[in-house]
Amino acid sequence: LKRTHYCTQVTTADIGKEVVVGGFTAKQRDKGELVFIDLRDRTGIIQLIFDDSTDRAVMQKAKEVRSEYVLMAKGTVRRRESINPDIPTGEIEIFVTELRILAKAQTPPFHITDETDTNEELRLRYRYLDLRRKQLQDNLMKRARITKVTRDFFADNGFIEIDTPMMIKSTPEGARDYVVPSRIHKGSFYALPQSPQI
């Protein structure tokens, strides 16, 4: 399966069309003959639906899905029976005909939501999970846009960007250094700097 849309790119204009979306499972609700999955990607959330007309194997997969599983889903866009005005895709849902579980996940140590009361130490320990929160993703996207605008400005004004390695004295703490031998001072070594890991 190859993604055709990000979650919030699917709109009411796509009703009746077949789409492929992918992302993380924000929530799974099993109501017996009905299964709902809120699929989250970097743009937002869309609801996937499975009912008694869904292929048995696909329905079984949907029932196995847990929080933060990575999924790809193919299906037909249709209007939701109960509209959710709180999200951009609240008027639509995807009736899934094909579901792939790309990666399973253990139960996360905290809920990945914008409003979290999780202590900072736990969030930093699981930074890769914390970065899935919309607030932090928005910060990363803003930073990327600012960096691009800055680079474009300097490039348009004749500047050349040059990335050079910076040699520093090796430090005993932290991660393993990438050691570079000195050509001038035989037997001496430099280390490439370590980037902060937060």
For each predicted feature, which ranges?
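Class II aminoacyl-tRNA synthetase-like tRNA-binding/catalytic domains
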Residues: K2-I198
